[in-house]
Amino acid sequence: MLPPVVLSGITYAGAIALMACGITIIYMSTRTFNFAHATMATWGFYITYVCYMLYGGAPYQYFPLSFLFGAMLGVICYFGINRPLLRREASPITLMMSTMGYDIALLATIQIFCDYLTYKLRLYPRRVIMSTYETMVWGVPASFFISLILAVAIPVALHMFLTMTKFGVAMRATIENPTLANIIGIDAEKVYLASWIIGGGLASLGGAIVSMTITGTPVMGNMIIVTMFAGSILGGLYSAYGSLLGGFVVGLAEYVGTWLLASYWGGWLLGYRMVIPLIIMAGSLLVFPEGLAGLPWGALLAALKGALPGKGKEVSS
């Protein structure tokens, strides 16, 4: 059996992959870096926590509600902020800054919500350890299986949606060439709305899952926003599939890498865990700015085959 830190690391990495994918989907369609992703993730945790405390059962059964709530937050952001700015052809900087304002508003509502939970429902929501409510399956936390299954199932579902449905094909066309898509009659605004629904839903779903591995607080999302963006950038800002891979790699490197370093150099290193995704993000931007999806994988595989013994030269008879 894998060590507990590796199991938690894989769970954490799967959640980061989902959130990084949400960032990329929104950016690909609207060219907006969604900094509200952080607090959307926190809201996903609180939806799961409150439903579990009020209605019981297992925390995982409320993950779909977290997704739906995040999708609603995405719809509000699109109609209230993003669409008016897109219609005015706002710059990417303006679009990004507008999401920071939305993030502040969401964070304020979380603080109010936590006060309500404390004084009216007698809950203690400002420091929650959701792992205490875990269900064990064959000696392994159930969140491990859920995170791993979703990290595989969502890319498959996303691929089927984008390639096998009429709206998915229209969405791809709009992302690749918005002007041409409008000319042939595709409603770009529906595509933008769909991207915010998917992106917001993935943010809150990822937040609900990641709370099973870290302490849930009102600022939980702000503690992992660097990791989310590092995963999105490593995977490639123009590839939803790449962002899933990038998010998983960054999340696993941060969680397990920090533990390995702390085991050798001391626990004081745990306070610097954000350095790992920062280094990965900086290295990615310097070495391959288009991310993993932009690498010439065909040429790399051909070069690897050529370097193998007996593959680089033809044997003459």
Language model regions located:
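Inter-helical junctions in multi-pass inner-membrane proteins, predominant
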Residues: 1-15, 158-166, 195-238, 255-272
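Membrane-interfacial amphipathic/re-entrant helices at transmembrane-helix boundaries
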Residues: 1-19, 47, 58-61, 88-93, ...
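Membrane-embedded helix boundary and interhelical linker motif in transport proteins
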Residues: 7, 29-76, 260-267
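Short, non-helical or kinked segments that cap or interrupt transmembrane helices
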Residues: 25-45, 59, 90-93, 167-170, ...
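Alpha-helical transmembrane segments within multi-pass membrane transporters and channels
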Residues: 56-102, 245-250, 254, 288-289
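Transmembrane helix-bundle core of multi-pass membrane transporters
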Residues: 84, 92-164, 263-274, 299-317
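Helix-loop-helix "hairpin" substructures at the membrane interface of multi-pass membrane proteins
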Residues: 136-216, 221, 240-246
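Cytosolic-side transmembrane-helix boundaries in multi-pass membrane proteins
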Residues: 176-183, 187-190, 261-317
